[in-house]
Each structure stands twice: as structure tokens, then as C-alpha cells.
Amino acid sequence: MSLFYPTRDEVREFFFGLWAKSRAGEALTPLESMALAIVLEHPEYHEVLGDPERHREREWPPEAGEPNPFLHLSMHLAIEEQLSIDQPPGIREAVRRLEERHGSAHEARHATMDCLVEMVWQAQRNAAPFDNATYLDCLARKL
């Protein structure tokens, strides 16, 4: 799996595999451990992760109103990676302040995810680089 640009199938296999490994009590890599902590906060996705044959090719169109679990978990993982290296600089402090406001680290991550999704969409739509300053401004507006 490419660490920076995984395919849809690679992302799904990563989450299916880590769920199976965790259920079997197998050792996890540091990245898998980080991802497992996120998965454990989302029991609504455990059935999906436990049944790869049924869900490997499943689509979650936005108009259906049900979030794509793999996209959601991947966004959480991206945020945790950003926080671990404070990239963009200042995100740790911004998310810490969101945690205070929301009273929950998980809810702060969801608020952060709203901004991250918007920034990725803008970058793709405009064929432009990710705008760190606008991302941090979006987080500040959530306070």
C-alpha cells in the first residue's frame, strides 16, 4: 500500500486487516494501533469491518445519507497524523481549543474533519495546493 496515495481498495484492506488482527489478538504496527483507537470510537462501523466479503465492493453514495466508513476513518487517521507532527503548524493548539469548546476529543476531531473535507474539496476543485492558512482559519471559526 502506498502510504501517501493509497487506492480505495488498499484503504479498505488496511481497515479490514487491522480489525481482523485486533480481533485475533495479533500485534499491530504503530499506524495500525493509531487506526484501531479510531475504529474503537466508531462501533457503528464494526459490523462493516467484520464482514469484508459483504462490504469490500460496497458503495456509500452521499445521496444515500450514510457516511462511507472507510472515508470517515481515513479522515480521522489523517487528522491524528497531522496532530502527531503539528502539521500544519498550529493545528495541535487549534484542536486543543476545539476539545475545550466541545468537551470531547472525538467531537473536536469531527469539527476538524469538517474543515479538512472542505479544504481538500477546494484544493481539488481549484487544482490548487492545500491552503494551510485557510484550514487553520476554518478551525478558528469553529471556536
What are these regions (language model features)?
Residues M1-H46:
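N-terminal leader/targeting peptides and immediately adjacent processing regions
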Residues M113-M119:
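Helix-rich interaction surfaces within compact, conserved domain-sized segments
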Residues W121, R125-L143:
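Glycine-rich, aromatic-bearing surface loops/beta-hairpins
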Residues L31-E99:
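Aromatic-anchored, charged helix-turn/loop surface patch used as a conserved interaction hotspot
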Residues T29, E47, P89, H106-H110, ...:
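Short, solvent-exposed positions on alpha-helices
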